[in-house]
Amino acid sequence: MKTFSEMSLRPVILVALFFLAILSSVPRVEAADAMDWPHWRGPEWNGISRETGIVDKWNPKGENVLWQSKEAAGRSTPIVMNGKIYTIVRDQPGTPKEGEKVLCLDAVTGEKKWEYAFNVFLSDVPDTRVGWSCITGDPETGNVFALGVCGQFQCLSPEGKLLWEHSLSEEYGLLSTYGGRTNVPLVHRQVVIISAIVIGWGKMAKPAHRFIAFDKRNGQAVWFEGTRPLPYDTTYSTPVLTTINGQRLMVFGSGDGGIHAFQPLTGRKIWTYNVSRRGVNTTPLVVGNTIYSGHSEENIDSNKMGALFAIDGTKSGDITKTGEKWRVTEWFVGKSSPIHIDGRIYAAEDKGTLLVVNAADGKLVKSLKLRGPVRASPLYVDGKIFVCTSNGIWWTLAPDKAAGVKVLNRTRFTSTEVYGTPIVSHGRLYVPTTGALFCVGGKDIKPKAGKRPETAKETPREEDAEIAHVQVVPVECLLKPTVDGGQAQEFQVRLYNAKGQYLRMAKPDEVEFTVNGPGKIAKGEIPGGAAPRKGWEYSTPKENVHTAVSVTAKFGKIQGEARIRLIPDYNWKFDFSNGKVPITWVGCRYRHISLDFDLLKKVEKESALASQLYIYLMTSFTNSNNPAVTIGKAPQVYNDGSPRRTWSAMLRFLGLLGQVKNVDEAKAKLDPAFAILAREKFVARHAWSAPGGGVQLAVTRGPRKVDGNGVMVKIKTIPKGARSQGWMGFIEGSNYTIQSDIQGATKDNKLPDIGLSAQRYTLTMLGASQQLQIRTWPTQLRMAKTVPFKWDPNKWYTMKLEARVQRSAGGATKAVLKGKVWVRGEKEPEKWQVEAVDESPNIKGSPGLFGNAIDAEIYYDNLTVTKDK
């Protein structure tokens, strides 16, 4: 069994004075030991070390290799802190117990100190991309932070003890995909910040690249903010810290194609520079007040691909036009992050050309072909640039005024690849590869480092004591209401100035709290801790409800907000008769809708096109950004006048793309279907127009709600959300059964895949292969069991998955999973059709859904979750 902790992050009561001490302290950002390397880009976040005496030459076959560790091989860039080297890698690869682990070695000898292993679950990432992220160390506490490919975010002590953890997928909606792109944590003072594409709940149901700041000491969520919704990509650009105009900033590349600057303690956005139509993966480089970065996608203002650019970081707001210092297109700097040396930028293109560029104006000085693609970033130390191609060609270069760079040495790895970046610490060079982690150095190492250059200072907070930002902590939580009263949650109100600097805690009499939803919040003495103290405490309602609550703290004219999900203990039942997908479900709204199944089938008998139009319009109305559209007070407009080309998207879904070229043809094809939907009072009116010669359609929703058999539909109208996971509740759940009526539609003789999840395992009806499968990791199938199972489209079935944790007398633990499917209305079969045992078990996890509706819709009804007796 993996070394999971069974601890859960229940509502935490914290002493206000304790937090005040934490928040008032301002520890140094750099490593306590000047030669430690606590972040993959180094203590200065720029790929530069001030050490000297680093070897020029080495060879993987032995020359200057002090030690190597095959167990530490992988994609990740390691870190070094307090004499230990940390990395994240595959665990027991190719076995039924394969997972992921944090590995700690002695930095001098390579001796293994400890490991912390955990499972990969409910993720499409392949095993070869496990260990994508990098460990981040906290010099103040010595703790390390790790993000696994499936969203397991953990804080570990220097001895490898789990201090706290979050399942970012189940709790917040982190997206884990086949691409494997996983972000890297950033520590700043009392918070640790992590990001991902998040498909959450409530106002965060639509995908966006979002950042969550957790208190590094206890894991409480402090702030939760994001960039523009509906990004095209997951990305792995790491945020870096800098100070500009006396203000501390976190600068990063985003999945929305922009470079952004946020305040790290508040999450408040300071500026945005939009540059790419797809996500930015390079980690920004900050030199003074200038930010350098690149991408290898299409530019937003032309059809040219790729760019290297410089931004003026002193600006604010949307600086797309006002903040650009220079940009050179058709340089494909999309994977490797640049470095800056003596007024020049050294940046590696994806295909392997090293560019040497004047930092001031972007003019090319020289270039060097590196003979292979590059994913790792260059390292500069002791007058040398180290860079390696992904096919294993290692270069040792020296900056040269005339030639750009001078080649000092070149060597090559065999039968290995390089994705991680070399680092240096205490006179030793560490080189990560997929074959081994190498430690490189001379025989008599005498570590020595020069002084780091002075960095810009923050404006003393005493110069601005005016309150400009109110922060309610925790910003998100999940509570269990019961008829007996349920749980309570203490809230803190933290106050910041305009530069995002912490000022103080608010006093109870200074803040007016309001609650939007059931439950109540009261101020007064809160028990617990060393002694009772004054504060605010929210109490759940005395009823078993699935609902969302927001609490708002108003300080003068400024306010802050926190969100609460109320989810009772099992047993649950959902029939979707209210026409809504439960707001508390993570990753479900937006990708699922509720509709009237009786109306759908009635319309389908008259016109298949009208039934498909009903699905499309219901999705569009439900997911509209304009609430007036959802309730029929304003029309939803479809045209091709924006990059999303909503008119073409509708035609594609209806199978009419290329068949309708003007308004007259559109009327001929669609007006009969609209007439049917108008008769049923689902559509109030629709209108055609032709602005600029193109087709435009405006549709206003009618008064009809879901008044027949309400069902939930996994829709295929969202191409990037057609295959997805969803989660329904708390992650501590174990030993329960999930059951639902399900139906799969068909299109072009293709069927969807339909699944229910329990305890991080999924029972899936596979459409194309006509199989029934229990699994935990779809792309690895380490413990999966599969049986033939023929099923038909447009037919209701009942699906049932049972998850159990079994512990033997000797202490061994395993998970036992059982699944069955039968035609709805028929007698439930006594025998389970598929059973699986996992000797490396998931011992807890949220109930949930899996669906692959790329080919056709999926319908759910009468869903239940029951606790085992």
Describe the residue ranges of each PLM region.
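Extracellular carbohydrate-recognition regions
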Residues: 36-39, 567-641, 650, 668, ...
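Short flexible loop/turn segments that cap and initiate beta-strands
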Residues: 486-489, 496-527
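Flexible glycan-contacting loops in extracellular carbohydrate-active proteins
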Residues: 828-858
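Short, aromatic/His-centered strand-loop micro-motif at the edge of beta-sheets
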Residues: 778-798
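Secretory/extracellular carbohydrate-interaction modules
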Residues: 598-602, 606-619, 630, 707-710, ...
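Noncatalytic, solvent-exposed loop/strand surfaces
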Residues: 31-476, 485-492, 498, 567
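Short tryptophan-centered beta-strand motifs in secreted/extracellular beta-sheet-rich domains
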Residues: 576, 740, 796-810, 817-819
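Extracellular/luminal low-complexity segments enriched in Ser/Thr/Pro
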Residues: 519-546
